[in-house]
């Protein structure tokens, strides 16, 4: 697999010829001075059109919450919606060799599920509940407690 692909327009055909999955990200980077304004944003779609399996990455623990938004942003620049979802679910599980255990809702797989009040790739959507290994995770923490206390 190739990792941290973000500014690779000049070599897209070569990357595709390698026939390996590509970890893209983050796509929030500004273009280089000699790139089009949408070079980084359209990269996932360009790779997909060349038959490359893609996965989005955050490269930092605090930014992992933004993976769905990276996928959503990529759909605005040509990546098909279903492929964007795969890039943050089953594709990631498959390239790490755990696709038989994680990454999709299938019988016999670990039940890791995010329940939201809308489109999971939309920044306006709120996560309502998370299940990890089939167990509901508390949706409160110190930040939500402070918010609730001081919003009264």
State where each predicted segment sits.
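Small/polar (Gly/Ser/Thr/Ala-rich) solvent-exposed segments
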Residues: 120
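Polyanionic/metal-chelating signatures
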Residues: 8-11, 126, 132
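His/Asp/Glu-enriched, well-ordered alpha-helical/loop segment
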Residues: 13-116, 125, 136
């Amino acid at each position: 697999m190739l990792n941290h692909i973000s500014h690779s327009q000049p070599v897209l055909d070569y990357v595709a010829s390698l026939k390996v999955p590509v970890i893209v990200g983050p796509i929030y980077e500004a273009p280089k001075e000699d790139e089009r304004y949408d070079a980084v944003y359209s990269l996932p779609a360009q790779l997909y059109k060349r038959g490359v399996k893609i996965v989005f990455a955050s490269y930092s623990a605090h930014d992992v919450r933004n993976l769905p938004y990276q996928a959503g942003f990529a759909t605005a620049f040509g990546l098909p919606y279903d492929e964007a979802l795969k890039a943050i679910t089953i594709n990631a599980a498959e390239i790490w060799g755990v696709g038989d255990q994680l990454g999709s809702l299938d019988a016999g797989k670990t039940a890791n599920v995010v329940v939201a009040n809308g489109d999971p790739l939309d920044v306006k959507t709120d996560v309502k509940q998370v299940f990890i290994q089939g167990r509901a995770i508390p949706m409160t923490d110190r930040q939500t407690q402070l918010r609730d206390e001081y919003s009264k």
